[in-house]
């Protein structure tokens, strides 16, 4: 069982995330501000938020486990991911920003539908279903990571870990929308970056 200091730290962490949602609740006064933050989130926050959401439990739990089991052959995953991320932000993101502003689109399905003059909404419906299907699977993997973290670190039952992690996300997203999501991800992304840099160094010196 984890010490009470760890429980207190995790408690403060979860409360802080929900406090961000409460703070941005008053900032989301329109549909566009709730969905896209009025397109006013800076590139640092946007980039860190996107990468924290994209990597999340996979980067800190899945990839280290894969490297431990398979060795440095897993480094190709990192190289491919880094290259793909760079190309995405270099070429896809700027063009997508310009085009979505041009069509005043709030979501990818609505942009594709407007771009291709899909008056009957077939493309919008199909693309929304595809996104919903695959993101449900990906989101589930993040909740699994949350459950495993609570179980291994705090000794809390896996199911309760999933519920606590998922419940926290639902609360701050429901309250603050896109802005709350971006800033909580930015905060967590900074923690992830710090952990990636510090933990290997500490492990190396402690392990001799």
What are the functions of these language-model segments?
Residues 1-5, 65-76, 152, 205:
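Helix-coil boundary and interhelical linker segments in multi-pass alpha-helical membrane proteins
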Residues 1-60, 173-176:
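Membrane-interface "cap" regions at the ends of multi-pass membrane proteins
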Residues 14-17, 53-54, 81-85, 131-132, ...:
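Residue-level recognition of pore/gate-forming positions within transmembrane alpha-helices
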Residues 35-104:
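Membrane-interface helix-loop-helix modules in multi-pass membrane proteins
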Residues 43-49, 114-115, 188-202:
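Small-residue-rich segments of transmembrane alpha-helices in multi-pass membrane proteins
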Residues 76-173:
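Helix-loop-helix module between adjacent transmembrane segments
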Residues 94-98, 202-208:
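Extracellular/periplasmic helix-exit of transmembrane alpha-helices
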